[in-house]
Amino acid sequence: MSKEIRFSSDARQSMLKGVNTLADAVSVTLGPKGRNVVLEKSYGSPLITNDGVSIAKEIELEDHFENMGAKLVYEVANNTNDIAGDGTTTATILARDMIVNGMKQVEKGANPVLMREGIERASKAVAEVLLKNSHKVETSRDIASVATISSSNSHIGELIAQAMEKVGRDGIINVDESNSFDDELEVNEGMQYDKGYVSPYFVSDTDKMEVEMDNPLILVTNQKITNLQEILPLLEQVLKTNKPLLLIAEDYENEAISSLVLNKLRGAFNVVATKAPGFGDKQKEMLEDIAVLTGAKFYNKDLNMKLSDLTIEDLGTIKKVIVKKDNTTLIGHSSSEAVNARVEELKTQLANTKSDYEKKTLKERIGKLSNGVATIKVGATTEAELKEKKLRIEDALNATKAAVDEGIVVGGGAALVEAYEELKNQVRDTNVDIQKGINVVMNSLFAPLTQIAINAGYDEEEIVSIQKTAEKDFGFDAKTGDWVNMFETGIIDPTKVTRSALLNAASISALFLTTEAGVTELPKKEEPQQPVMPQGGMY
């Protein structure tokens, strides 16, 4: 396949068009008066959303160089989503601003390698200021405020705050569809462990890259499954029940994984394999907890129990299982009495142990078994509304968890402007090109506030000018048009979200500016069609 190669300004300018196209589509969603974007889906109804990463993911441009530029900015949004779970639109806006202004300097002859040094230095300095200015999330009201800002819906904010109150700040909260038109909060017994599927080929929902199973059978063992022959009698029994199967084992040989995946893809049976959490004695204890929760018999290798002896009676079951890349959530229980008895047993151990490590481990296990799993059930009148609402709640939930991790800063883009005012005379360098890189980051700190003002229909230059001289913690409420104390009004952002958005934007921008060549595949030339000869003979 032939390739097209473009160099220096030609390559960067082509990719910049893609950056602008993607950023234009994403930036309209920012702020309390941000709009939605409609995404065509290959099946089902269109998706209406204001989620930056969902929009960026769908953008594919015809021109290969423009598409490369768009995909680079998508990486900013995606990485921010992976780290913080929200802030993807802010990350995209920051990245575009840094790239556009950085390009202007490079085109004028600035050294992009030295500019990169300035970009990295300034972004780290801003990130440190954000952490310094961060406030701990202390009240349920703080949690509700973060969720409300992220979802633009006070009802959703209250629902998430209630969920965290019931299962704890480190508890498990899932989002599911409701059978009614109303939103509901449901709390079940259950737990989560930090191991996901052993192969992505087990995934049934490719959008979320996860597997959901209702009422699955569950095998719990600390043994290694080497091939399907040793559990074949069990699989044949499971097949007759027509129920899905979750395997939790210490490890799997590649042969066993390949056989399971092949049977899953062929539709022979619905199965997902995960590794057992923990190591050594801790692994055995956690598997015993899972066995109690699910009603399974723990097949312990230390007791010389053979996998070939397994029967369907040895398997447990549970209301629902959600398996993701890095974790598995078990929702429900087989017996409340058994779970309560297990919790009491662990509490007795906790009272008798003197080891700080053991105390910490036992508290974690008690918390996992006793706090349960909260499920926010989303109701809506149409499929399109349901999809959009679910995305909003998932974003708000991620933002809230990020706030619990690192605290909160003033929202509405004000935190970045405050960081600018604090650092504008501190982050300096005598090297002209390094200073230009610093300026690229510093000047980009106004971009989110600027876009919020534009989306709300206000004069962005006036808003930014007032924000620069505003009292600390005061900012612009784009919903009402008032200048308010952001913490008192509940206009706050998770520090982790804002910090991750900035650092990811700076990272990709620096790489973009140091790009000197681009290589893409040439579009295939369509073969000229042969003329069709008329049918029939002579008359």
Task: Write out the residue ranges for each language-model feature.
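Long, structured protein-protein interaction/assembly regions in large complexes
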Residues: 127-406, 410, 523-539
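Conserved phosphate/anionic-ligand binding catalytic regions in large, soluble enzymes, centered on
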Residues: 26-36, 77-95, 152-177, 372, ...
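A structural-propensity feature for long, helix-poor, extended segments
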Residues: 105-149, 212-215, 309-333, 428-488, ...
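Extended, low-charge hydrophobic alpha-helical regions
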Residues: 60, 66, 376-539
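N-terminal, positively charged regions that mediate nucleic acid binding
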Residues: 1-43, 538-539
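Residue-level signature of catalytic and energy-coupling elements of molecular machines
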Residues: 15, 31, 85, 109, ...
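Glycine-rich oxoanion-binding loops at beta->alpha junctions
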Residues: 45-81, 198-209, 220-233
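Short, hydrophobic/aliphatic alpha-helical segments
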Residues: 14-24, 66-82, 236-239, 364, ...
